[in-house]
Regions:
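Acidic active-site catalytic centers that drive phospho-/nucleotidyl reactions
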Residues: 35, 67, 78-80, 93
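Catalytic cores of nucleic-acid endonucleases
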Residues: 87-134
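A short beta-strand motif that forms part of the nucleic acid-binding face
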Residues: 80-83, 114
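Solvent-exposed, charged helical/coil patches
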Residues: 1-53, 134-146
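Hydrophobic side chains within alpha-helical segments
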Residues: 38, 70, 96-99
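Short, contiguous strand/loop micro-motifs
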Residues: 25-26, 82-84
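A short alpha-helix capping/helix-coil boundary motif
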Residues: 16-19, 74-78
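Active-site metal-binding core of divalent-cation-utilizing nuclease and nuclease-like domains
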Residues: 43, 47-76, 86-89
């Protein structure tokens, strides 16, 4: 058992998009409490405050995994637990955000507390991010030379 776990970890840690797909699949099978809660909330408000299908643990450009993604409006949502408060992870998250936004995605970062806390406030943040992404997509499609 331990030997197979070691091989599995090495395989998942291998560079490349295939490794990211494996990691994303594992994360879909074992979401955090906040990710489970947000998935339920997104299903609840989908078609109302938010429209369109979303994907969980989506691999973006073969380089990044985002917790939730609405492809129709290019909205990525990340749920950040305590680990994201470390100095290293804060820097990495800023780098990831810059790359995602430069690729034309709108990124909404939520803490576990925001997801598990005040539901009305969360709905407002989700609606605002969704409309921001929708408007951003409209602007980029109507830009000269596009």
């Amino acid at each position: 058992m331990m030997a197979s776990m070691g091989r599995r970890r090495r395989r998942l840690a291998a560079p490349g998009a295939k490794a990211l797909e494996l990691i994303a699949a594992e994360r879909r099978e074992h979401p955090t409490r906040a990710e489970r809660a947000l998935a339920a909330i997104l299903n609840e408000v989908n078609g109302g405050a938010l429209e369109g299908r979303f994907r969980r643990e989506w691999v973006c450009g073969g380089r990044w995994i985002v917790d939730f993604y609405f492809p129709e409006v290019r909205l990525a949502i990340e749920v950040d637990g305590g680990y994201h408060r470390s100095t290293f992870q804060l820097g990495w998250d800023l780098f990831k955000a810059a790359e995602l936004e430069s690729a034309g995605l709108t990124l909404l970062r939520l803490t576990n507390q925001e997801v598990l806390g005040d539901r009305a406030r969360l709905h407002g943040k989700l609606r605002h991010a969704w409309w921001t992404a929708l408007e951003s997509g409209r602007r980029s499609r109507s830009a000269p030379g596009q």
